[in-house]
UniProtKB/Swiss-Prot annotation:
Its cofactor is Zn(2+). The keyword Ubl conjugation does not apply. Keywords: DNA-binding, Endonuclease, Exonuclease, Hydrolase, Metal-binding, Nuclease, RNA-binding, Transcription, Transcription regulation, Transcription termination, Zinc. This is Transcription termination factor FttA. HAMAP family: FttA (MF_00870). Residues 578-636 are annotated as: Metallo-beta-lactamase C-terminus. One of its GO terms (biological process) is DNA-templated transcription termination. The lineage of its organism: Archaea, Methanobacteriati, Methanobacteriota, Methanomada group, Methanobacteria. Residues 384-577 are annotated as: Beta-Casp. Terminates transcription on the whole genome. Termination is linked to FttA-mediated RNA cleavage and does not require NTP hydrolysis. Cleaves endonucleolytically at the RNA exit channel of RNA polymerase (RNAP); the 5'-3' exonuclease activity of this protein degrades the nascent RNA released from RNAP. An RNA nuclease, it bind single-stranded RNA (ssRNA) with a preference for U-rich sequences.
Amino acid sequence: MVSEMLEEIKRTIMQRLPERVQVAKVEFEGPEVVIYTKNPEIITENGNLIRDIAKDIRKRIIIRSDRSVLMDPEKAIRKIHEIVPEEAKITNISFDDVTCEVIIEARKPGLVIGKYGSTSREIVKNTGWAPKILRTPPISSEIIERIRRTLRKNSKERKKILQQLGNRIHQKPKYDNDWARLTAMGGFREVGRSCLYLQTPNSRVLLDCGVNVAGGDDKNSYPYLNVPEFTLDSLDAVIITHAHLDHSGFLPYLYHYGYDGPVYCTAPTRDLMTLLQLDHIDIAHREDEPLPFNVKHVKKSVKHTITLDYGEVTDIAPDIRLTLHNAGHILGSAMAHLHIGDGQHNMVYTGDFKYEQSRLLEAAANRFPRIETLVMESTYGGHEDVQPSRNRAEKELVKTIYSTLRRGGKILIPVFAVGRAQELMIVLEEYIRTGIIDEVPVYIDGMIWEANAIHTARPEYLSKDLRDQIFHMGHNPFISDIFHKVNGMDERREIVEGEPSIILSTSGMLTGGNSLEYFKWLCEDPDNSLVFVGYQAEGSLGRRIQKGWKEIPLKDEDDKMRVYNVRMNIKTIEGFSGHSDRRQLMEYVKRISPKPEKILLCHGDNYKTLDLASSIYRTYRIETKTPLNLETVRIQ
């Protein structure tokens, strides 16, 4: 059946290509159709031709050279340097003879691409190698280098994975698509361990696979993967909406226990979730609480990950097409639009989203081709969950920092490495640069620095204002001199014993990491301030402190339990959240186009989810459901 489809596609391609094009072979690689040719320049010079063929066959098409026409790598390197302007600042060139691609890493990748792709086409024409152009981040990133190295070293294995996947995807559906159902396997009427299982007569897809970092035990920390209808053997695809551990943290487990299929996400999500998963493993090891997977399973997931840009339509199963749209939550966060069958049903899973532009990101997308079912988060769905404006939140932060510095104190801001940390860095950089906040050192601890490096490698995912600032004004706030990377415990002691300063450190809920160590050092001094800017889950130390706990039993540096008396100033500043508040959630339902027929709510405490569902139904007369974990809902 697959061979019949491939032969049909080949015939269409051959009929449409000019006769002088020498096609060596056509094959499936994952969701793409790859054409290997002995004279690729003829095709690449006519971009509209391939675009039109792709539209006709409804598949993504990649053009590569046949191995027989590839230039010797050493000669190709010299030729590439002749073609590409020196201003591009090429940092590395490597060759993948499995895919016949040349990987070019540069500080200014746009100059390697050239106007309308002109420079890239020259590289193909003169060397035969198909250029794959990557940005060299201004901040060196160990994670990005490890991922790129893994993909280079395992290119042959990855091609085999993609070919097998291509054969799986490009089959004709066996059954009519007359039903679709969703099973809540985590993150429903709760926050954490998000996991949603989509079943159709032909396919099985998992949307997110997270952990609850504040769960306490295995029963409450991990998704319900033991439901009878779920098996790894039957799973066609996994979609990860964004990198936070409550959405991606349990993904390596699937590979540990036999899953060998694809993961779909944006490129920033792949990079960031790899960072967070490796850190999760490291912390668990240090705390002698091993996880049910290890580093090699993270590596395996990287090899199976297929990255997609926003708006890129991709076949992920014989009867399902996926398109990712901006969610505005963190870098690379996405809403997943799933087109089931020949349009019999369309659903959107929002993941976590922010329906407001921030300094860091654009507002979440709200226009889709079709929607029958919307699965939407409800983190701040309670009627009282109205957050102040960003401007007001920033003023409140400045006020708190100013008063603390006047007392000679230090400001500890526990943050997630990804999202709020970068938002705050942009705010602090501007206010210190313009003199609104006194120039004091801002210490960056934990994974935040590495996460910053990933942000600098993916500027196309940042807000337009920030992109303009970086590219047109030459000002990148992430590499400002006010920020200092913390290296090791000795430096942390110097910071807490030193002059007034601002400390940004993980974890965001004080559930571990270096922020907890800073808290223990600083909490008994009333001159210091602890500022919460993000969500504090029920059961976390952060939530207990918010509730007013003044005596906190924790292990000290000698691993002995002692009670810490909290005397520092505690401040919670709403408005920096990467989640939509109550007004934004209601506005999103009002503005989304087209209107869904039904809405399922997830990712919210029990009463907030129910409160939001009731309000949506009363206001918009749209059917709403609030499934519990383990419940299944038929959506078609």
